[in-house]
């Protein structure tokens, strides 16, 4: 079944700057098949190939969502952080947008105990318990709560490893990529001209720096996920 999100406009892609790669001095030869040309020292990605691969990723995501699969969206660079959280919440996905903690997936049991601690502290805060404690003790717990929220808020309701991980910047999130490979978790990854497409299951050649590009692609992927959830099998 085709999804509404697969109506991909090349004009919209151009307007969002999806096709702009990095400077020609900064590239990975493995991205050569996805590069159309270079202009003023900048690589230009082959927009038709990007559109095709994005369409495939959207269809894959919709089908996975229809089967109840769980998604994790990862993007911790400053220009992507708020876009990641907004898109994830809209599509009911888990997300990491501040810092990838080493072992977030490969050492999930330890991370899960921290998530449990976050929930405990939030329950205590909501019940007014923290305000009834001695000032020093309350201050320590409140600092702990702030820290846990900062890094774990997006996976607070994740009770198991995700089935699919969407990654915004392959190089920035190298540890996340490595953990997914080690655990055999499929990845959908934006790959700019300096990335290695072989490290991801479903590469989407695209500008991974511009907010407009990140927003546009996230919107397509999360729209597909939402549509898939509406036709759960």
Swiss-Prot record:
<dbReference type="InterPro" id="IPR005706">
    <property type="entry name" value="Ribosomal_uS2_bac/mit/plastid"/>
</dbReference>
<dbReference type="GO" id="GO:0009507">
    <property type="term" value="C:chloroplast"/>
</dbReference>
<dbReference type="InterPro" id="IPR023591">
    <property type="entry name" value="Ribosomal_uS2_flav_dom_sf"/>
</dbReference>
<dbReference type="GO" id="GO:0005763">
    <property type="term" value="C:mitochondrial small ribosomal subunit"/>
</dbReference>
<dbReference type="GO" id="GO:0006412">
    <property type="term" value="P:translation"/>
</dbReference>
<keyword id="KW-0687">Ribonucleoprotein</keyword>
<keyword id="KW-0689">Ribosomal protein</keyword>
<dbReference type="GO" id="GO:0003735">
    <property type="term" value="F:structural constituent of ribosome"/>
</dbReference>
<dbReference type="Pfam" id="PF00318">
    <property type="entry name" value="Ribosomal_S2"/>
</dbReference>
<keyword id="KW-0934">Plastid</keyword>
<keyword id="KW-0150">Chloroplast</keyword>
<dbReference type="InterPro" id="IPR001865">
    <property type="entry name" value="Ribosomal_uS2"/>
</dbReference>
<dbReference type="InterPro" id="IPR018130">
    <property type="entry name" value="Ribosomal_uS2_CS"/>
</dbReference>
<protein>
    <recommendedName>
        <fullName>Small ribosomal subunit protein uS2c</fullName>
    </recommendedName>
</protein>
<comment type="similarity">
    <text>Belongs to the universal ribosomal protein uS2 family.</text>
</comment>
């Amino acid at each position: 079944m085709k999804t509404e999100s697969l109506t991909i406009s090349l004009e919209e892609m151009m307007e969002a700057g999806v096709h702009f790669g990095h400077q020609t001095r900064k590239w990975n030869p493995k991205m050569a098949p996805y590069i159309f040309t270079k202009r003023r020292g900048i690589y230009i990605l082959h927009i038709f190939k990007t559109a095709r691969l994005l369409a495939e990723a959207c269809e894959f995501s919709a089908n996975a969502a229809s089967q109840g699969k769980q998604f994790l969206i990862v993007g911790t660079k400053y220009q992507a952080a708020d876009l990641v959280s907004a898109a994830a919440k809209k599509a009911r996905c888990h997300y990491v947008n501040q810092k990838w903690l080493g072992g977030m997936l490969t050492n999930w049991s330890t991370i899960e105990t921290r998530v449990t601690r976050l929930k405990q502290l939030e329950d205590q805060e909501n019940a007014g318990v923290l305000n009834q404690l001695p000032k020093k003790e309350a201050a320590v717990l409140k600092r702990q709560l702030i820290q846990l929220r900062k890094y774990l808020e997006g996976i607070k309701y994740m009770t198991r490893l995700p089935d699919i991980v969407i990654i915004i910047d392959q190089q920035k999130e190298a540890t996340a990529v490595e953990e997914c490979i080690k655990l055999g978790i499929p990845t959908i990854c934006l790959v700019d001209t300096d990335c290695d497409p072989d490290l991801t299951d479903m590469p989407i050649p695209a500008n991974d720096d511009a907010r407009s590009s990140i927003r546009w692609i996230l919107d397509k992927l999360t729209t597909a996920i939402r549509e898939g959830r509406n036709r759960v099998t």
